[in-house]
């Protein structure tokens, strides 16, 4: 498992690409901000205007564009450049594994797109390290293949279709992040992802993410990074926003959160498995990071699982 795989696992992400928008004539589709949710729009055909919260002017989306909001920034999709035609409503229906959102009748579609949604642990580092808006092109063969699969599933009512579109969301997220990271130094990043971009820190970060339970002292970390203590402390803080020791502690807690929700291991066992020396120390560190005790975090999983399905504000 590489570092991107691990960060996605620690984020505890679930999702689906189960909404298809087929818009004609005039239409208006607002999307509100939701905590611990991400949204992606994949433009298959046509074009649209999109007004994003905090931006003075609407952007234009065209066929082949993919726009991703890791933290579901508030935005409006519209047929009009002003994005203020709120009287033009959207009709919603179900067709197999997909929810179909449509407008108008007859004529060519002015916009054909798929919407993906992602839900994740609200502390998910990978989703907070990305910028508010990620815009990439779907000209990569892997993304083209994924869109073709979505189009096929939406055009045919086949058994197991829902499982396929749910699984494709995981593939889509990896492809989005991978494509964005491949843009290089011009792509704004924060936290762990920004640290990974620095060759001097990459090996250290990758090793800690893969083995947080190891004993991590400053001597071991400086040796792995081939930096002096002062250099490591300064560079790590500069690139990630936290100290090396805080980073180790953070990854241990993220791994613990996964174990608390996915296993029945005791809190003590979880603490020891991720590198803490005592349940007391672990409990204090966990509550400082998550605001609740490890036991309460585990209990909250049942409430999260029973939460209402995701829906757009249309």
What is each of the regions a protein language model found here?
Residues 14, 39-42, 142, 146, ...:
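Amphipathic, well-ordered alpha-helical segments in soluble domains
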